[in-house]
Amino acid sequence: MACGLVASNLNLKPGECLRVRGEVAPDAKSFVLNLGKDSNNLCLHFNPRFNAHGDANTIVCNSKDGGAWGTEQREAVFPFQPGSVAEVCITFDQANLTVKLPDGYEFKFPNRLNLEAINYMAADGDFKIKCVAFD
């Protein structure tokens, strides 16, 4: 995938919320939101897969520490629809990242890197970002 939006120096602190809203492409196969320290140190690789890498209608999450991927976590809840607008809200603390999906469903992913601030965000794939907000 070619690189889409990249933002750095975010300084997102524990308890603060990152809201990302955008349009899912009508022919979407997958998209990615990466959060962390930099591209080689990700506390969250959030990858909804409509039909990609052998997965269908599955959210795959992972972390990357010093360039090495961790163990994938899969979520069966999949509220994303091709051709629709979707919003994801992500908060974190020392233990977990909490991801709130468009249907209100929330799940947790462990903060394996123990980051005290999220400074990096990258988005890619079949998702056109319309708004990024910090609450």
Swiss-Prot record:
Query: Any idea where the Galectin domain is?
Result: 4-135
**N6-acetyllysine: residues bearing it:** 13, 29, 108, 128
Tissues showing expression:
Expressed in placenta, maternal decidua and fetal membranes. Within placenta, expressed in trophoblasts, stromal cells, villous endothelium, syncytiotrophoblast apical membrane and villous stroma. Within fetal membranes, expressed in amnion, chorioamniotic mesenchyma and chorion (at protein level). Expressed in cardiac, smooth, and skeletal muscle, neurons, thymus, kidney and hematopoietic cells.
The domain of life for this entry's organism is: Eukaryota
Q: Which GO terms describe its biological process?
A: apoptotic process; cell-cell adhesion; myoblast differentiation; negative regulation of T-helper 17 cell lineage commitment; plasma cell differentiation; positive regulation of apoptotic process; positive regulation of canonical NF-kappaB signal transduction; positive regulation of inflammatory response
N6-succinyllysine occurs at which residues?
Answer: 108
Positions binding a beta-D-galactoside in this chain are 45-49, 53, 62, 69-72
- Give the main location: secreted
Where in the sequence is N-acetylalanine found? Answer: 2
UniProt subcellular location = Secreted, Extracellular space, Extracellular matrix; Cytoplasm; Secreted
Pfam families in UniProt: Gal-bind_lectin
Give GO cellular component annotations, separated by semicolons.
collagen-containing extracellular matrix; cytoplasm; cytosol; endoplasmic reticulum lumen; extracellular exosome; extracellular region; extracellular space; galectin complex
One annotated GO molecular function is: RNA binding
Coiled-coil ranges (or none)? none
Q: Which residues carry this modification: Phosphoserine?
A: 30
Q: Which UniProt keyword terms apply here?
A: Acetylation, Apoptosis, Cytoplasm, Extracellular matrix, Lectin, Phosphoprotein, Secreted
Q: How is the subunit organization of this protein annotated in UniProt?
A: Homodimer. Binds LGALS3BP. Interacts with CD2, CD3, CD4, CD6, CD7, CD43, ALCAM and CD45. Interacts with laminin (via poly-N-acetyllactosamine). Interacts with SUSD2. Interacts with cargo receptor TMED10; the interaction mediates the translocation from the cytoplasm into the ERGIC (endoplasmic reticulum-Golgi intermediate compartment) and thereby secretion. Interacts with CD69.
Function comment: Lectin that binds beta-galactoside and a wide array of complex carbohydrates. Plays a role in regulating apoptosis, cell proliferation and cell differentiation. Inhibits CD45 protein phosphatase activity and therefore the dephosphorylation of Lyn kinase. Strong inducer of T-cell apoptosis. Plays a negative role in Th17 cell differentiation via activation of the receptor CD69.
Protein name, per record: Galectin-1
In the record, what lineage is assigned to the organism producing the protein?
A: Eukaryota, Metazoa, Chordata, Craniata, Vertebrata
